[in-house]
């Protein structure tokens, strides 16, 4: 029997300890925790939580959340400075939502309400014990609820942006100054979340120790998060988070030869989350625009050169653009349409190769006239006859009869 009583005492102590330090399965802490003091739970909160939020006991979680947001904005002390009762009303609304907005707590609360309706002589002690059981968690979740009102969602530390480059910028390399939206430390409070001269008071839960002990267990106090004190004020600019939306700038040195979709990383240039953690990174995805003159294929480029059909036959000269300027090329005699001429090393820089540049390919586009004058026509007809004679001669020279006749 002694052994049983000893086990029972320790089980009860463990349950009491868990309630005191706020251990709840599935609980998640908000990204920015500022341990803002909230007045203790008022006895007026004995009202039914569903009535406080103006919803039905069968209301969905979304309906409860929507009603809470509307009421919280309406009765928030910041917008009701001349209405002392608004603070009590806001606290009542917050307490109701902290219970009904959590599925586990709501289930326990509903069971309690059912019991109270069954036993007429219930003295209300169950309701008060329910509040005390969760009171240590109310301060812990206050910032999360406060953030929901003002839509201060969790911040992802890394930032991803895109930067457009022209082909010439990608080929030669350049320096770019980039501005982008980011979360930065609040200037008003220097990222503290509260005024630098904000008054502090001893934590009522741990009485300044920072730890809660219920033999044989000891753990960090969940009300003050181990600091031993709580702050009664919060920064109005950042609403206690220490973080605000702002703009950052970064200078980016882009090497020559970068390709589209390449990503450049700047460590520590992303969003800030707290003064005790490192900022996220900035990831810049490059987008190289298509060029009206050149077509790119890796480190090689292609350009078209328009020539006449007489230049294609007789040869000649043509001026073509390159990345470093225009140059004059010799057109080989007998150039065929779409024939390529290679200019070695005239392409884009290569990264990490022994050959430091790609090539430029000149594609000859042969233009044929749609109209000719009489003289040109006569010349072309004569040329055509000559072609036919040459073809017949070539054909005859290759025949068995021609070979016999020529050898006599």
Swiss-Prot record:
Cellular location(s): Mitochondrion
Protein name: Chaperone protein dnaJ 1, mitochondrial
Superkingdom: Eukaryota
GO cellular component assignments: mitochondrion
Function, in words: Plays a continuous role in plant development probably in the structural organization of compartments.
UniProt-listed HAMAP family: DnaJ
Origin species: Arabidopsis thaliana (Mouse-ear cress)
Transit peptide per record: 1-26
């Amino acid at each position: 029997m002694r052994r049983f009583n000893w086990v029972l005492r320790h089980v009860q102590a463990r349950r009491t300890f868990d309630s005191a330090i706020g251990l709840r399965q599935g609980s998640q802490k908000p990204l920015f925790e500022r341990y803002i003091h909230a007045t203790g739970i008022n006895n007026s909160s004995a009202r039914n939580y569903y009535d406080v939020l103006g919803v039905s006991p069968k209301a969905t979680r979304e309906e409860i959340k929507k009603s809470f947001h509307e009421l919280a904005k309406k009765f928030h002390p910041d917008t009701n400075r001349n209405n002392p009762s608004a603070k009590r009303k806001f606290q009542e609304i917050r307490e109701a939502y902290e219970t009904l907005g959590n599925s586990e707590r709501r289930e326990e609360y509903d069971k309690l309400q059912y019991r109270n309706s069954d036993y007429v002589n219930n003295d209300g002690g169950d309701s008060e014990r329910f509040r005390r059981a969760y009171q240590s968690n109310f301060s812990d979740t206050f910032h999360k609820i406060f953030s929901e009102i003002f839509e201060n969602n969790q911040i992802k530390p890394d930032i991803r942006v895109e930067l457009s480059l022209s082909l010439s910028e990608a080929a030669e390399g350049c320096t770019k100054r980039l501005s982008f939206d980011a979360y930065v430390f609040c200037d008003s409070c220097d990222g503290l979340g509260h005024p630098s001269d904000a008054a502090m008071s001893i934590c009522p839960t741990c009485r300044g120790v920072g730890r809660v002990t219920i033999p044989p267990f000891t753990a960090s106090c969940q009300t003050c998060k181990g600091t031993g004190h709580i702050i009664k004020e919060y920064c109005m600019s950042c609403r206690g988070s220490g973080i605000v939306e702002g703009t950052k700038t970064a200078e980016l040195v882009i090497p020559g030869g970068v390709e589209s979709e390449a990503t450049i990383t700047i460590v520590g240039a992303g969003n800030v989350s707290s003064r005790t953690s490192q900022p996220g990174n900035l990831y810049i995805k490059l987008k190289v625009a298509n060029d009206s003159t050149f077509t790119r294929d890796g480190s090689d480029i292609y350009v078209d050169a328009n020539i006449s059909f007489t230049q294609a036959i007789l040869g000649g000269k043509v001026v073509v653009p390159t990345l470093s300027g225009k140059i004059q090329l010799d057109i080989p005699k007998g150039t065929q349409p779409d024939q390529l001429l290679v200019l070695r090393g005239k392409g884009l820089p290569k990264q990490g190769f022994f050959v430091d540049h790609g090539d430029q390919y000149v594609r000859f586009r042969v233009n044929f006239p749609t109209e000719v004058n009489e003289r040109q026509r006569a010349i072309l007809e004569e040329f055509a006859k000559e072609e036919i004679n040459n073809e017949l001669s070539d054909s005859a020279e290759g025949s068995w009869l021609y070979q016999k006749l020529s050898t006599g």
